[in-house]
Regions:
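Short terminal hydrophobic/aromatic SLiMs and anchors at protein ends
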Residues: 8-13, 33
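Cationic, low-complexity basic patches in intrinsically disordered or flexible, solvent-exposed regions
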Residues: 20
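Feature recognizes metal-dependent phosphohydrolase scaffolds
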Residues: 2-5, 30, 36, 40-712
């Protein structure tokens, strides 16, 4: 899926749906319908008889059908396609998984994908609950999740490996058969690796229950083993099971942040079959850093140093932090920097000497951040961020600062690079450092590749199967009405138009054909998206970074949430937002993340009488104590919604060696009165539209308007 221009525009929806349809059909894709109008609510059974006849005076109408006839040149071909599409409409809808706020926790993220949020474990139990012991089921699941690594352990300990291969392949084929049962053979075939496509298809569609076929099936498996291909086959079919267990992955923002593996998550997604993302505030911060926004660069580095997680910066993207370390030691070497000591959960991971160096670097980049932010606030007075230019409020002789009219003592008054007369001016050494950091981000090829992926698969919001997806907030007035927000001088928007135009502005920062002035403004605007009060990715009164570092009084640390967060429990407010975005249907929802759900304090992630679901459960290990859990997955399958609540994941190594899985608790949120079919989904609407056009083509064939086999 490649989103080139807008956020969920009608044209984009058609383009994306077409690509999804290609997964469902073996035929060549039909020509896209240009007007993008919503599909008619009529059923396919009565579409043909009451349709409007073809208008012979409308040349485009006939021209379109002639173009369509190139793919379906005969009555037989068009009829066959209608039969195929109608059959697809009657399949169960695919399983969607929703995740939010991963924050660089790559091991937990990858494990949740591998075990399909516990669904594979349930499938194994459904199949073998009465025939395999618990320990054997656990071993089989571990093999499915981590086939390469588990095979090495098995081969080192199994006395009769060929016997193990034979039994295990039978088990894996049974699991694969179950998870593939809701899809067409065509779609399953496309998920199969080329080397084993035919073999897996044969094994899926034949069973040993039939005495006539038992020898055939066992013969295939014996040959796989005797030719030395058992390992490769097992790895291949395990990957197929993983892929077919999740039809579509939705990420509601914040892949990036404090965790060590955001780059690993992006590498995983680059290979993933179907996914989309609604950008979060941390994602746009990294986008801004790549675009060249120096304040964003400082924020990205500061957050990594705050949690002593430099792996993504240094190992993932090759960002050179040596100049920062050198500058920090020279400038702050005699500063205790106590308030800048990193937050380290595992003290054995970072020794004291390294923590001390990180603290120096942390302060150096924080001061640079405040300067670069101040310069942008000065450059853009229309953003009304002057109150965040806190260097102006410091009495450098007394070591105090005035916040909201109250004078507070500073924890530290050591600002060797800040001039009281011109506090936001960079020293020559700071400027040289900033230039080097800027260059390092701009030339990171891997970061370019990953941000390109975010742009291709992402947007500010998405509407999918009557669900409105966005990361954080919709700016609201106190009365719950949509708030007008100025994103460019003289250009204000609200609701859907606001998110759409912010998405366009984000893309302008990376498009070579953008005007230089527009591109620079878009690059600057990333900072406002990160921490501006009216940003739909932030929506708080302020980001109290300076206060947390330098002021003891915790009252100054308070960040007051915007009206959306105050009103989102109100069902009528949620309904009005859904109406404004054009989300219809009796079972419509808002799904978002951003603000951790404090389960340990009794907070419920389901709000507004079930119409709003907040799925930030704290994937990041830093939030585990705060939320009491280790993240959520929202699962939307053919029978309804389930919320899967995860407990902390130890490590992939423990999962492989000890068979430890993420312990999860599943809650039924909303169940359908009947099993939902493809016909009930967005893809189904598009398939119905295609059926209508094919029926019009049949009409044209049968009434001599267009000749079969491409004739005129």
């Amino acid at each position: 899926m490649f989103i080139t221009h807008s956020n969920n525009s009608i044209t984009d929806n058609i383009r994306n749906t077409k690509e999804q349809i290609n997964d469902l059909s073996t035929r060549a894709p039909m020509v896209s319908i240009a007007d993008g109008a919503p599909a008619s609510p009529k059923t396919t059974e009565n579409m043909f008889n009451d349709k409007t006849p073809i208008d012979m005076e409308e040349k485009n109408d006939v021209k379109y059908l002639r173009l369509l006839s190139q793919s379906f040149p005969t009555v037989a071909a068009a009829s066959t396609e209608i039969i195929n599409l109608q059959a697809i409409l009657n399949l169960p809808k695919g399983t969607e998984h929703f995740l939010a706020d991963i924050h660089g926790e790559h091991e937990a993220f990858r494990h949740v994908l591998k075990n399909a949020s516990g669904n594979i474990r349930r499938k194994v139990n459904d199949l073998f609950g009465n025939t395999l012991r618990e320990s054997e089921q656990r071993e089989l699941c571990t093999l499915i999740y981590y086939p390469d690594e588990k095979l090495e352990l098995v081969k080192a300990s199994e006395p009769d490996i060929n016997d193990w291969y034979h039994i295990t392949i039978h088990y894996l084929v049974a699991v694969c058969r179950l998870v593939s049962s809701k899809y067409t053979r065509s779609k399953v075939r496309k998920a199969l690796p080329v080397d084993f496509s035919y073999i897996i298809q044969e094994l899926l569609h034949e069973t040993t229950d039939d005495a006539n076929k038992a020898a055939y099936v066992n013969g295939i498996i014996d040959t796989i083993i005797s030719t030395g291909r058992a390992d490769d086959f097992i790895i291949a079919i395990c990957n197929v099971i993983q892929q077919l267990s999740i039809d579509q992955l939705h990420i509601l923002g914040d892949i990036y942040d404090r965790g060590q593996g955001a780059h690993i998550i992006m590498d995983t997604l680059a290979r993933y079959h179907r996914w989309d993302i609604q950008w979060g505030n941390h994602d746009v911060l990294w986008m801004g850093a790549l675009a060249g926004n120096k304040a964003c660069i400082c924020n990205v580095i500061r957050l990594s140093l705050r949690y002593a997680n430099l792996t993504t910066l240094e190992d993932g993207y090759g960002i050179n932090l040596v100049p920062l370390a050198t500058f920090a030691m020279e400038t702050y070497g005699d500063d205790p920097c106590e308030e800048f000591m990193p937050k380290v959960q595992d003290s054995s991971r970072v020794d004291q000497k390294t923590q001390r160096l990180i603290a120096l670097m942390h302060k150096a980049i924080a001061i640079l951040q405040f300067k670069e932010e101040g310069l942008l606030w000065q450059k853009h007075p229309e953003w009304h961020m002057e109150d965040r230019m806190l260097f102006n409020n410091i009495n450098y002789e007394k070591g105090t600062i005035v916040i909201d009219g109250v004078e507070h003592p500073l924890r530290s008054n050591h600002f060797p690079t800040v001039s009281p007369q011109s506090p936001y001016a960079l020293t020559p050494e700071e400027q040289e450092l900033m230039d080097k950091l800027h260059h390092s981000f701009r030339v990171s090829e891997k970061l370019h590749r990953h941000i390109r992926l975010l742009l291709q698969h992402g947007c500010m919001f998405n509407i999918c199967n009557n669900n409105l997806l966005f990361h954080a907030s919709i700016p609201l007035n106190e009365d719950g009405t949509l708030k007008e927000v100025e994103i460019m001088p003289g250009k204000s928007y609200k609701g859907r138009n606001l998110l759409y135009n912010i998405g366009m502005l984000i893309r302008a920062a990376f498009q070579d054909d953008s005007e230089a002035e527009e591109r620079q403004y878009a690059t600057d605007y990333f900072l406002y998206l990160w921490c501006g009060p009216d940003s739909p990715l932030f929506d708080k009164s302020k980001m109290a970074t300076f206060e947390r570092y330098f002021i003891e009084d915790k009252a100054t640390h308070k960040e007051h949430k915007g009206n959306y967060f105050k009103l989102r429990d109100n069902e009528s407010i949620v309904d009005s937002i859904l109406d404004a975005f054009g989300v219809t249907g009796p079972n419509r929802h808002i799904i978002n993340g951003h603000v951790p759900v404090h389960v340990s304090n009794g907070e419920n992630p389901i709000k507004a009488n079930g119409k709003l679901m907040v799925i930030d459960g704290g994937f990041s290990s830093a939030y585990h104590k705060e939320t009491g859990i280790a993240g959520y997955t929202l699962v939307y399958h053919s029978r309804g919604f389930q919320l899967v609540q995860h407990e902390p994941f130890t490590s992939a190594a423990d999962a492989i060696q000890k068979g430890l899985d993420i312990r999860s608790t599943t809650y039924i949120i909303e169940m359908s009165h009947r099993r939902m079919l493809v016909a009930d989904t967005d893809i189904g609407s598009e398939l119905k539209r295609q059926i209508v056009e094919l029926q019009r083509l049949l009409y044209a064939f049968r009434h001599g308007i267009i000749s079969e086999n491409g004739g005129r």
